[in-house]
Amino acid sequence: MAFCEDCGAPLSEGVLFCENCGAKVTENKFAAVKAGKAVIEEGILYTNLPLLAESLQKTEGEVTVILEKFIETAQNRGIGYQLCDASKSIAGCGSVDQHIAIIKALVEKNHPKYLFIIGSSKIIPSIVWKNEASDFESDADVSSDLPYSTLDTASPFDGQEYDFDNCLKVGRLPEIGIDLENYFENLESGCSKLEEAKTFALSAQVWQEESADIYKNISDRQVFTSPACENTTITNLIEENTNLFLFNLHGSNKTEFWYGQTGNEYPTAMDHNSLSYVTSPYFLMVEACYGAFYEGRSCINSILLSALKGKCISFLGSSRIAFGTPCP
């Protein structure tokens, strides 16, 4: 049996980090290299197992098996994740400050590149700041996971600068309505096709010029527009095996839809079923107000959650009002 060089605790076979103190286990890393599973980058898989299991209506053991399987497949891609269960140190959901203290300790010891949060803000809280960039009552505050990247809870509205080259690369997977096993299988399949982008873009007609200027950096294909394209016709335009979507539409905190625009006409361009027929794992980028808003919603009234329930493996959007230019 191997033992941790830092704290002396016994090590389980194959682990990359000491389960007692979090120290990196170099012996197991060398063993992984020898077995053809070289770890190039390291990351933290961060959650609260009891709360996550309760939300998923599974046992902690069942959830652990799912997460450990993901860790194994990620290692085959050169990423060594350490599973960190915040409930070992924090009672209940805890505060952002408490979670950052845990993550800081792991970062200082192991220098990971990635932080993958598993669970909604009810599992691992997001910080909430006063929104200094908006006069809208509905946007009086803004929630963010930025502190988990910078390890700093100070509001960006205070004017400080960030060195993002040296920050954690952070993603969050809300568990609401999601089949974790299905998501991780899609992630594994989709990651193997990163170089085979097949794209689709849809813009509100009034922003077509701006959208085309962005899209040209991704693809030489046309940008479809709404009202010409609506939620009842979009499936006819999406080609088989499309795996990269770009949307520049209106959104609302009152409804689950995304909208096009021409003049004073705002037709429904997207709903929660619009991408349910996509058969390949895909990446989605959206510039729409509340495009990534999910708190208090479910898969039937959130395009974000319905996408993640389907084949979406990465979603980039705004949880509040999105600001952009109407032309290049």
PLM region spans:
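Cysteine-dependent hydrolase recognition
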Residues: A31-P328
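Cys/His-rich metal-coordination motifs, chiefly Zn-binding "fingers/knuckles"
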Residues: M1-F30
